[in-house]
């Protein structure tokens, strides 16, 4: 069909369609929810789409996304088209990095927060969106990495779980010439080594960096991890 030969559809399948224990006939589909926010109307449309595909329930993910557990493989083109037609007002297919970097709610909402973590994530997303053209293998590698292995916390409480992913940012305010400004540390390396799980350690010598430098350092680290 026309949609099956579409480059955007192929990119979406590569990043959002996941295997299940039922083999090739049944897939799971991940909806990438910007900032983890859906309106009531959007949520109803997601539920209707899941029901149309044969899923009687959906799962909420730790990444603030939604998983449709069961979608028959032949329905994937129709599922994608309905996403575009019925939920085109929200980027559930990860067209941009904006809104798809996991953060805490940040200082604009949290009473003990120090930095506006979502705003920092938007700065990082803007850089990443400019870095590679869409629909390339390299871009897909970066999408997968950012979707699951990057988190930002607006203070040392680490509400996003940033020490437990491969690239994490922990923010901390600093007094610079009498003005309070957001800084942060870049952490990386969480994983399993010789069967033993471990958290990330401080990168870049553990130094606190201002936001712009922090974003640049994070992009460079992601390029290394994604082998770009």
Feature-to-residue mapping (PLM):
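Peripheral terminal and linker regions in Fe-S/redox and tRNA-modifying enzymes
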Residues: 1-228
